[in-house]
C-alpha cells in the first residue's frame, strides 16, 4: 500500500457505454441474444476502449465498467448470499429516476468465485510495460448502505439479526475478492464510495435508510472496522 498516487494524472475508470453495447444489453434483456453474444460485444468494445486509453497516454487501464448495468450493483450481485430484485422506484437524481434494481440478502454473504475476477483477467491481458490494469469496485460502505436502503433493511435484519456478524461477513467477502484479484495479477484496486455524499444531508440519509442505520452508528462501525 502507498500513500502517494503512482501517476501524475489519472482517471476514475468508468466510461460512457457505446451505443453498440447498450443495444446488445437491451437485446439480451429481451431474450433476443445469448449471454455469450453479449460477452463478445463487451470484449470487443472493451478492447477498443483500452486502445483509446493507451493512445491518450494513460498509465492505468480499465474495462470502463462496460460489463455492468450499474456502477455498483453488479458487483454486489456477484457475492454469494446476495440477490438482484427490482423495486417500485429507482434512485432519484435531481428529479430524474434511474433504473430500479437493488441488492438484498438471501443467505450468508461470501466472496467466493466472484465473476469480477474473470472480468479483470481479460483487462490484465492488455497490460504492457507502460500500463497497469486496474479493478474498480464499490466500497464496503456502499454495500452496507444498499442493504439498508428503504425496506431492504428488514430483509437484512431477518437474515442477520446480529449486525456485527453482517459486518464481519461483508469484510470477509471483500477480503476474498481482494485475494482472488491479487492471485489473478491485480496490483491496483480502486474503491468507489458515494456514501460520503449521503452523510452531508442528514435528512436525506434518514429518509433513505428509514432509521435502520444512523450516522452515529456508521461512525461507530468505521472506528471499529477501519
Label each residue range with its predicted role:
Residues 1-225:
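Domain-level signal for soluble alpha/beta catalytic cores
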Amino acid at each position: 500500500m502507498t500513500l502517494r498516487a503512482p501517476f501524475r494524472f489519472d482517471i476514475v475508470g468508468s466510461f460512457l457505454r457505446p451505443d453498440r453495447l447498450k443495444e446488445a444489453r437491451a437485446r439480451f434483456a429481451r431474450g433476443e441474444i445469448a449471454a455469450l453474444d453479449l460477452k463478445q460485444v463487451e470484449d470487443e468494445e472493451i478492447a477498443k476502449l483500452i486502445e483509446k486509453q493507451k493512445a491518450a497516454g494513460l498509465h492505468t487501464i480499465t474495462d470502463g465498467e462496460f460489463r455492468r448495468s450499474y456502477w455498483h450493483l453488479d458487483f454486489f450481485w456477484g457475492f454469494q448470499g446476495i440477490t438482484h430484485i427490482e423495486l417500485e422506484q429507482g434512485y432519484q437524481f435531481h428529479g430524474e429516476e434511474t433504473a430500479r434494481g437493488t441488492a438484498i440478502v438471501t443467505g450468508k454473504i461470501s466472496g467466493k468465485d466472484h465473476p469480477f475476477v474473470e472480468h479483470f483477467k481479460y483487462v490484465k491481458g492488455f497490460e504492457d510495460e507502460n500500463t497497469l490494469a486496474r479493478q474498480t469496485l464499490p466500497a464496503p460502505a456502499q454495500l452496507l448502505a444498499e442493504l439498508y436502503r428503504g425496506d431492504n433493511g428488514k430483509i437484512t435484519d431477518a437474515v442477520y439479526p446480529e449486525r456485527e456478524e453482517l459486518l464481519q461477513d461483508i469484510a470477509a467477502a471483500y477480503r476474498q475478492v481482494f485475494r482472488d484479484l491479487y492471485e489473478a495479477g491485480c496490483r491496483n484496486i480502486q474503491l468507489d464510495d458515494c456514501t460520503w455524499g449521503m452523510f452531508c444531508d442528514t435528512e436525506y440519509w434518514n429518509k433513505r435508510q428509514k432509521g435502520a442505520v444512523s450516522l452515529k452508528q456508521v461512525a461507530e462501525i468505521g472506528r471499529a472496522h477501519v
